[in-house]
């Protein structure tokens, strides 16, 4: 991709914008890696096509917050015969003998505050797709997320008073190895009272102490903060193996990005490992990305 940038004489700041804000790369590795130009151009086209379709932004965000996404999954799952269970604890994962493949689970469904043992049940299966929290012995820590949730009473400066924004501060502009992400939503999304805004600043930890300093460039970009909440670093887990030996296929943890691009890559990866083929979305033409071209 460096040759493409050089051909058009693009400045460093323009390259940062294209690579990190449009193509959504988390690092600058794509610039010098061979064969990445096509992938980068497809990502840029997806961004441009999305802008053409939605107008103000290439992104769509659910009303009432991200909790609507699992609700949408639950409804779609039910249409295809799936069962979505809340307040359910996995008691045991069963395998066909030592070193065998997964064969089922034992679990207990119990509402919070409910007396008694709850509803115990057992179900058979041939594959399990799960996040790292269910199999702590099958994952490793590959990094840590730093995150601050801030309450504002004003829109972020120099964003045209937008009621929602995503800002990406490229790593090279703040002397870091990882980008800093800012996602802001407001009462327009029914997530807070009118006149208030919720901004989340996140990045990958690069030091073992003074984590608030790593988020400082993002926090400064917000302006005056009414209230700030920042917890301990959040571990990022990745599976130790593919899962083909025991048919337990694990996802990665969420990273610091605010646009879910890496999450969609993880979905494709876990599908490839579990099914042995690439994920093909029905009704989507090859090479079209996730947005139809006009």
Name each model-derived stretch.
Residues 197, 207-294:
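C-terminal catalytic lobe of FAD-dependent flavoproteins
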Residues 9-13, 83, 225:
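Short coil/loop linkers at secondary-structure junctions
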Residues 61-62, 71-82, 88-231:
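Mid-domain catalytic core of redox enzymes
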Residues 1-49, 59-61:
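Rossmann-like flavin
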């Amino acid at each position: 991709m460096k040759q493409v940038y050089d051909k058009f004489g693009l400045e460093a700041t323009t390259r940062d914008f294209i690579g990190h804000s449009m193509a959504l790369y988390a690092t600058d590795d794509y610039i010098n890696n061979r064969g990445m130009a096509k992938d980068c151009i497809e990502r840029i086209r997806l961004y441009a096509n999305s802008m053409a379709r939605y107008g103000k932004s290439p992104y769509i965000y659910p009303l009432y917050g991200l909790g609507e996404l699992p609700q949408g999954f639950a409804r779609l799952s039910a249409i295809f015969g799936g069962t979505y269970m809340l307040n359910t604890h996995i008691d045991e994962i069963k395998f066909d003998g030592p070193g065998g493949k997964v064969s089922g689970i034992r679990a207990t469904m119990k509402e919070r505050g409910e007396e008694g043992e709850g509803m115990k049940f057992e179900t058979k299966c041939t594959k399990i797709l799960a996040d790292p929290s269910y199999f702590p012995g099958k994952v490793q820590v590959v990094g840590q997320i730093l995150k601050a949730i801030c309450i504002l009473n004003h829109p972020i400066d120099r964003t045209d008073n937008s009621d929602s924004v995503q800002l990406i501060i490229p790593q090279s502009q703040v002397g870091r190895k990882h980008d800093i992400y800012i996602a802001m939503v407001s009462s327009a999304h029914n997530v807070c009272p009118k006149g208030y805004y919720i901004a989340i600043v996140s990045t990958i930890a690069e030091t073992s102490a003074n984590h608030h300093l790593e988020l400082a460039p993002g926090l400064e970009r917000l302006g005056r903060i009414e209230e700030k909440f920042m917890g301990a670093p959040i571990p990022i887990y990745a599976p130790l193996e593919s899962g083909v030996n025991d048919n337990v296929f694990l996802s990665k943890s969420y990273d610091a990005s605010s646009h879910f691009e890496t999450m969609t890559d993880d979905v494709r990866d876990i599908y490839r490992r579990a099914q042995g083929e690439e994920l093909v979305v029905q009704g989507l033409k090859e090479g079209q990305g996730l947005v139809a071209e006009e």
